[in-house]
Amino acid sequence: MEENQKSKNKMGVMPVGKLLANMAIPMVISMLVQAMYNVVDSYFVAKISTDALTAISLAYPIQMLMIAVAIGTSVGMNSYMSRKLGEGNTEAASKGASNGLCLLLLSAIVFAIFGFVITPFFRLFTDDPQLIEMGVDYLEICMVFGLGVFIQIGCERILQSMGKTGLSMVTQLVGAVVNIILDPLMIFGIGPFPEMGVAGAAYATVIGQWVGMLMALALVFFKEHEIKISFKNFRLCGETVREIYRVGIPSIVMQSIGSIMNVGMNAIFSRILMSNAGIATFGVYFKVQSIVFMPLFGVTNASMSIFAYNYGARNRLRFKKSWKMTLCVTAIIMSIGTLLFQLFPQQIVSLFDSEGKITAEGIAAFRIISLHFPIAAASITISVTFQAIGHGIKSMFMSILRQLGVLLPAALVLALVFKSVESVWWCFVIAEFSAVTFGIISLTKIWRHEIEPMPDGAAV
C-alpha cells in the first residue's frame, strides 16, 4: 500500500517532463522491439524474391490477429491482477495469472489447428500457386508453433502488473536478438543450417518467440514475486474468466482492427487492381511505419496514465501541461517520420526490393502516406485522452474511422475511379483528416464542460 501511494504521489508531483520520460522510454523500447520482429523478417525475405515478400505480406494479417488475441487476453488478465493486488488479494491475483495463461494456451491451440488448414485464406487473394505455397509454408509454421508468442506476451503482462516493466522488456529484447541472428542463417542456409527460404524466416521467428517465452516463464515462476502462481489454479474459474474477458474482448476487437484493414487492402490490390506489387509495397510500408508509430504509442500510452491520474485528482493545470507536452512530443516524432519518408523513400524501399519490382511504387506510397503522420499525432493524442477521461466509445470510434470506416471505402473508391495503385495511398490522408476532425470537435465540447471547470491545482 505504501509503495502504491508513492507511485500515486509521483504521478501527481513529479515534474511532468521527467515523469513522461520516465514512463515512456521503457514503453517505447518495448514497442520498438516488437516492431523489429516483422521488419527483420521482411528485410531478409525480400532478399529471396518479391514474390516471397508478397507471400508473407498476405500472411501478416493473421499474425496480427494472433497478437491481437494474445494482447487482448493479457490486457484483461493484467487488469484483473492489478485490481486484486490493489485490494491486497494476492491469492485472487495468482488465480487470475494462472487462468490467463490457461486461456492463452487454449487460444494458441485453436490457432495451431487452423494453421493446418490455412491454404483457403491465401486463395482469397491470389491464384498464383507459388505465392500460395510460400504463404502457407510461412504462416503454417507461425501458427502451429505460435504458443511462444501467446505465453511470452502473457508473462510480460504478469510482470508488468507487478511493476516489473524492466524484466518484461528484457524478455522481448532476448527474443528479438535471437530472431535477428537466426533469420539470415535459416533463410539462406548459413553455417549448420540448410537453406529454408520463407520457412526459415518463420522458424527464426517462432524460435525467437519460444526463447522469449522460456525466459519470461523462468522470471515469472522462479523469481521472487509478491504472488506465487500455482499449477493447481490452471483449472479455469468461470468468474475469473468472465472478469478477464470483460476487459480483454474489447481490447481484442480494438487490436484486430489493423488486421481487418490489412485484409481489406490486400483484397483491393489483388482482386480489383490485380497488383502483387501493391500487396508487397503495402506490406513493406505497414511494417516500416511501425518503427515511426511505436515511439508515438509509447509516449501516448504513458501519457494516458498521467492524464487519467490528474483528471481524477481534479488538477487542471497539470492535466493541461501534460496534454500540451504530449501533443508537442508526438508531433515532433511524427514530423521526423514524415521528413525521413519524404527525403529517403528510395533508400528505405530498396532495403526490401532486391529485384527492383516495387521501388517506384514504394517511393510514391511512402511519400503520399507519410503526409498523414503529423495529423496522426493529434488523432492518437486525442484518442488516448478520451480513454483517460472515461470516453472510451469516442476513442474506439476514432480508431474505426482511421483504419476501417473511412479508410477502406476511400481506398475502394479511389481504386475503382482511378484504377491505379498510387491513387489508393491517399485513403490514409483522407481517413486521418476525418478522424482528427471528429476528435477535435468532440474534445472541444468535453474540454469546455469537463476540463475547464476543474480547479487549477499545481502545474509542475
Ranges and model annotations:
Residues 22-41, 141, 152, 175, ...:
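Transmembrane helical elements of multi-pass membrane transporters/channels
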Residues 22, 44-64, 130-134, 198-199, ...:
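Interfacial/gating helices of multi-pass transporter permease domains
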Residues 74, 78, 142-160, 168-176, ...:
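Short runs within selected transmembrane alpha-helices of multi-pass transporters and secretion channels
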